[in-house]
């Protein structure tokens, strides 16, 4: 019954790039960003001073040492920021970006360390220009490493799609994994082929080979596209890591309300396995909380009436709850929402009306917890997710859909990152041309 992502779901920012952050969150982001910029400035000044004062045989070693220390500091800074932000706002696209950045920086640091060790006894390979060339070549190497790992995951997801089709029937939405695999692997191979074709068919035949400015422009274009590819690869891995952690996170037993997110019901108004799993998980959590603390909670089954459904999903879940031990005063159904965003917004209105400032949980399927948590936070609900399980062949396809949704919700962040990467790529091209 769910409509495509509502415009409300795409007009917000995220984590470190969030629109409408409160002042403490802005101060938190700005403080770490300021420390990072100060460290980068110190590293840059140090490199420039060493370049002028050391003899040529020592410059490369000094520059590489400064870069290595800077990378280690950056990883530590990002890790501290991630740990603090997970406590403040677990469900955040900013956390996904930081996880991806830590991954990229860690691989780059290992790359620099490996390069340094390989040059021991041969200082000639540690020239400043050689180090620069190695650095700008790293994004392609990183992407090649990532495409092996992600390509294998794409293959496994595609296999799960085949099993999903065998059990659930052929539908386009059951091919999310196959579509993502074709887009990623096919797009990456085409990108590499385009780079080689551009150089062989444009740069060389027109006499631009050896022209430092022409090759600098070529470098800027290829480096930007490779960095943007690396960004999406890191975000994909970061989404997987945070999504896995979100599904395994166990909220404290102190909740006043639990929102149950609706999905498709049967033609007769019964709960299909996916939705039944969500409701049963909410019931189990309520029982566990009452046993552990003696505190009862209120169920908010949330979902409107979709096309072809004889009743709202909220009403169907309400009936199921009442016939499985819940009392009438323990259920407040929300029957108007048409997507996850509205689930959270309309349910928040109920919570604010009944008990402002209440502690809230939400129950949904494991692959859906992360995006639901992001939307809950943006709706003003400081809610924690509780995951129900689903069949092994259903989870990968559902998570791919969630990944597409999370990416679509954060277009402004992608644009900002793209602009930063573009500036870095242009700067690298200019440095290459000037120093050539």
Model-predicted segments: where are they?
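Extended hydrophobic blocks
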Residues: 18-252, 353-359, 363-436
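A structural signal for short, hydrophobic/glycine-enriched beta-strand patches
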Residues: 44-57, 240-241, 246-398
């Amino acid at each position: 019954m769910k409509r495509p992502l509502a415009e409300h779901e795409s007009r917000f920012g995220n984590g470190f790039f969030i629109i409408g952050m409160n002042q403490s969150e802005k101060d938190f982001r700005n403080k770490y960003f300021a420390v990072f910029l100060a460290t980068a400035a110190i590293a840059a000044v140090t490199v420039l001073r060493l370049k002028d004062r050391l003899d040529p045989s020592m410059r490369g070693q000094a520059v590489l040492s400064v870069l290595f220390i800077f990378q280690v500091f950056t990883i530590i800074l990002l890790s501290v920021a991630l740990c603090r932000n997970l406590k403040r706002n677990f469900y955040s696209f900013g956390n996904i970006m930081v996880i991806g950045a830590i991954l990229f920086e860690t691989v780059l640091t290992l790359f620099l360390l490996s390069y340094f060790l390989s040059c021991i006894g041969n200082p000639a390979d540690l020239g400043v220009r050689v180090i620069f060339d190695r650095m700008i070549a790293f994004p392609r190497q990183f992407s090649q490493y990532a495409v092996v790992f992600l390509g294998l995951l794409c293959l496994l997801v595609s296999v799960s799609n085949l099993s999903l089709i065998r059990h659930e029937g052929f539908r386009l939405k059951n091919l999310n994994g196959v579509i993502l695999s074709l887009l990623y692997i096919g797009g990456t191979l085409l990108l590499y082929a385009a780079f080689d074709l551009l150089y062989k068919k444009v740069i060389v035949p027109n006499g631009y080979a050896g022209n430092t400015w022409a090759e600098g422009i070529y470098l800027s274009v290829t480096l930007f596209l490779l960095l943007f590819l690396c960004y999406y690869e890191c975000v994909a891995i970061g989404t997987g890591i945070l999504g896995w952690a979100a599904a395994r996170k166990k909220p404290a037993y102190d909740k006043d309300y639990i929102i149950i997110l609706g999905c498709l019901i049967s033609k007769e108004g019964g709960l299909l396995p996916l939705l039944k799993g969500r409701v049963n998980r909410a019931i189990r959590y309520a029982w566990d909380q009452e046993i552990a603390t003696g505190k009862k909670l209120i169920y908010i089954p949330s979902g409107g009436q979709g096309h072809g459904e004889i009743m709202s999903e909220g009403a169907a879940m309400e009936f199921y709850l009442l016939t499985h031990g819940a009392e009438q005063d323990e259920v407040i159904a929300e029957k108007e929402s048409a997507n996850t965003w509205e689930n959270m917004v309309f349910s928040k209105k109920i919570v604010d009306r009944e008990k402002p400032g209440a502690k809230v949980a939400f129950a949904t399927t494991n692959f859906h917890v992360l995006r639901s948590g992001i939307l809950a936070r943006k709706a003003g609900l400081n809610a924690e997710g509780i995951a129900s399980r689903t069949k092994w062949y259903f989870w990968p396809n559902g998570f791919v859909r969630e990944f597409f949704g999370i990416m679509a919700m954060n277009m402004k962040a992608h644009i900002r990152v793209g602009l930063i990467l573009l500036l870095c790529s242009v700067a690298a091209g200019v440095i290459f041309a000037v120093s050539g």
